[in-house]
Amino acid sequence: MSKKLYLLQVQPEGKILELDPDNGELRTLVDGLKTHPDGIALDRSAGRLYVSYMGAEISPDSLEFFQADGRLESMTTEGNERRLLAGNGVFVTGKQLVHDAENHWLYWCDREGMRVFRARDDGSELTVLVQAGLFPAQSRDYTRHCVGVAIDSQHGHIYWTQKGPSKGGKGRILRAGLTLPQGAEADNRPDIEVVMASLPEPIDLEFDAEAGVMYWTDRGDDASGGNSLNSARLVDGRFTDHQILARGLEEGIALVSDTESGRMWLTDLGGNVWEYSLTSGGPLRRI
């Protein structure tokens, strides 16, 4: 049976889509979404999707989200039985979302809220794991904006990006424990480490735990290595061998891999879906 990709469309109308990457067949699951869906995760065994929302722009076409109206919801893979898991002022701007199916946790970033969250996949036990700044006073400091997230359950780590200003060359990938250290708060964790720094503008993350490889998209300046797919290898707790695997993204965002077929798919703000071969490498192929 062909595998499906679940995609989010923001403009001109918010939609949740299902794409067959082998034949290009596209199906709309949900339409009419008004609050900018951004992150999506699949629980294949339960047949459910999880979606984060950025909320409403402060003014039309501003692409600024400085009000606490982000949301997190779940639904079936057919777009039915929609349930609100978090919202009502709890966070500001929902970004990348990942699901730990084995332990029933959701992890996501709150960009303008400058935080990293987790909650059970029924919405319970909501916790702020990282707080990089104070909302709203520091929300326009883009070096504090948390965007992409990935987890390494084997070693008990969470990773996230703080992308920095557009094309600014100040992006970072950071790491901390999956749980708060005893006696610590989200805004003063002693276990936070910067594992990659001075990146053009890192966005979303994908961690291959079996291979020990971190992948990420970057939409920084082309001349500095932006608009690219990147990787680095985890060796003895440190990331080495940073490589730019492919270029040509039009402001890259999401990525997801299928190690069984040796493929990765990526999306960008240009409305493209790209395929990359993890086995042979080579250029991106537009689907």
Region annotations inferred by a language model:
Residues 1-5, 34-47, 88-105, 134-156, ...:
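Beta-rich, blade/repeat-based domains predominating
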Residues 119-123, 176-185, 231-237, 276-282:
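Short loop/turn segments immediately following beta-strands, especially the blade-tip
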Residues 15-17, 61-64, 70-73, 115-118, ...:
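A short loop-to-beta-strand structural motif that recurs across blades of beta-propeller domains
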Residues 1-28:
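An edge-strand/N-cap motif at the start of beta-rich repeat modules
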Residues 30-32, 81-90, 127-141, 181-197, ...:
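Surface-exposed loop and turn segments in beta-propeller and other repeat-based domains
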Residues 5-8, 52-69, 161-172, 217-225:
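Short, conserved, GDST-rich strand-edge loop motifs in beta-rich repeat architectures
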Residues 267-287:
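Blade-level signature of beta-propeller repeat domains, shared across WD40, Kelch, NHL, RCC1
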Residues 10-12, 54-56, 111-112, 121, ...:
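Short loop/turn segments immediately following the C-termini of beta-strands
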